[in-house]
């Protein structure tokens, strides 16, 4: 009797759900199995956009080059081929290259279009259901997912592709501010900001850059101040790609954070002494991050989050040269000022640009609240997301690793650290497919 494939239900309508769908189909094809039935439950249609691409404005760029953005792990040039097929040209008329940083709206169209093609193929086994999942429970060896309208769907495996929660509330330094925007990615969040408003942007990361450039384009002459404790802006990608360094050489012993930091510092000094840029050193470590992070004990992970994470993030998650050119022009013109010492009374509106809260935080999702309450999932030791193994299989309160409940994306930040950029999302999607469809 031919082997069948399990049914899979993916909760979430962003790009990660499409990566999981594609990975499952590729895995089944590689094993000579029938394509699994995949159902994606999404609050917003079309599937594939999510907040990252569905709320992006036309000038918002990807933070990774086009060569890294393919949906398929087997066809790394897929996104570039798509751009060539559609005849895409940048604002300066140039064609896309491997090192191009493409607008996020364009990438969202690529992802959503790929999923729509699967929906349009009656033989694909892929379906989409619009709605909000509010609970996942075990029912007779399967998983039952209940939607807000009381619809119940069942599958053998559930993958949580929940995306990013809204930012946590920020009270300081907003005391005295006329009004606040708690979530800049909520629909219409920036519409109430006027050209004459004195705007405080809380945070100096990638979200701040998106919001600052958006407000400056909407309201030429607007005056903005960005604030954070250390005023660290994201670093900038090199003009041309440089091959990555080899990363860390294993000593055969369990890594500890002090030793890893010493070795990383040594490599940076070596690069500097040779007149080479630092970016390839960090890029060489990137493929090793999941294994290194999982090998660290809870104490070292917490130390990293407390003392290293912010500087790691601004160097790891870099902006394109064109984005830096626009941002630096705002700073040079006085449109945007950076200040660590601000008073709320000086501003008409404050925008929370601190980034998403933890997926494991209570109150933002009835689905997450229910899973935590039932012990089906637990927060990771650092409180950044859910505890899980390298394949995204979630750990329950009893300590066991689930064979039916997985996660991908921001939910795995505390388990794997680097989880939200496309290369890591694609990698975890492949691992999930390998677990769901073993050889």
For every predicted segment, state its role.
Residues 1-45, 51-54, 93-258, 262-439:
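Flavin (primarily FAD) cofactor-binding/catalytic cores of flavoenzymes
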Residues 43-90:
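Redox-cofactor-proximal catalytic regions of oxidoreductases
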């Amino acid at each position: 009797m031919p082997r069948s494939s399990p049914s899979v239900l993916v909760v979430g309508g962003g790009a990660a759900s499409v990566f999981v769908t594609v990975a499952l189909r590729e895995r089944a094809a590689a094993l000579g199995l029938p394509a699994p039935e995949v159902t994606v439950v999404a609050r917003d249609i079309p599937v594939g956009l999510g907040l990252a691409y569905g709320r992006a404005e036309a000038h918002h760029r990807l933070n990774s080059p086009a060569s890294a953005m393919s949906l398929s792990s087997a066809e790394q040039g897929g996104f570039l081929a798509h751009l060539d097929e559609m005849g895409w040209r940048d604002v300066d008329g140039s064609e896309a290259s491997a090192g191009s940083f493409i607008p996020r709206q364009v990438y969202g169209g690529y992802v959503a279009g790929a999923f729509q093609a699967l929906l349009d193929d009656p033989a694909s086994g892929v379906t989409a259901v619009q709605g909000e999942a509010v609970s996942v429970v075990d029912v007779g060896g399967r998983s039952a997912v209940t939607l807000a309208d009381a619809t119940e769907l069942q599958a053998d495996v559930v993958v949580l592709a929940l995306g990013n929660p809204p930012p946590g509330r920020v009270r300081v330094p907003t005391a005295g501010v006329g009004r606040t925007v708690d979530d800049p990615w909520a629909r219409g969040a920036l519409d109430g900001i006027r050209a004459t408003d004195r705007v405080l942007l809380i945070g100096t990361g990638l979200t701040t850059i998106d919001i600052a450039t958006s407000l400056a384009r909407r309201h030429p002459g607007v005056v903005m101040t960005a604030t954070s404790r250390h005023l660290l802006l994201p670093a900038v990608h090199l003009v041309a790609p440089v091959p990555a360094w080899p990363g860390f050489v294993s000593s055969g012993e369990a890594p500890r954070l002090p030793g890893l930091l010493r070795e990383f510092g040594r490599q940076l000094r070596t690069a500097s002494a040779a007149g080479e840029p630092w970016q390839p050193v960090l890029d060489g470590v990137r493929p090793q991050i999941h294994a290194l992070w999982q090998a660290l004990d809870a104490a070292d992970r917490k130390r990293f989050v407390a003392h290293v994470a912010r500087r790691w993030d601004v160097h790891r998650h870099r902006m394109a040269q064109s984005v830096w050119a626009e941002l630096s022009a705002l700073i040079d013109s006085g449109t945007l000022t950076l200040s660590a010492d601000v008073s709320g009374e000086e501003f008409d509106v404050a925008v929370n640009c601190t980034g998403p809260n933890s997926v494991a935080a209570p109150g933002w999702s009835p689905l997450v609240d229910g899973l935590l309450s039932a012990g089906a999932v637990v927060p990771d030791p650092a409180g950044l997301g859910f505890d899980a193994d390298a394949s995204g299989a979630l750990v329950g309160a009893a300590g066991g690793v689930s064979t039916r409940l997985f996660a991908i994306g921001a939910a795995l930040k505390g388990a794997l650290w680097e989880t939200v950029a496309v290369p890591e999302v694609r990698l975890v999607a492949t691992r999930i497919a390998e677990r769901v469809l073993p050889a």
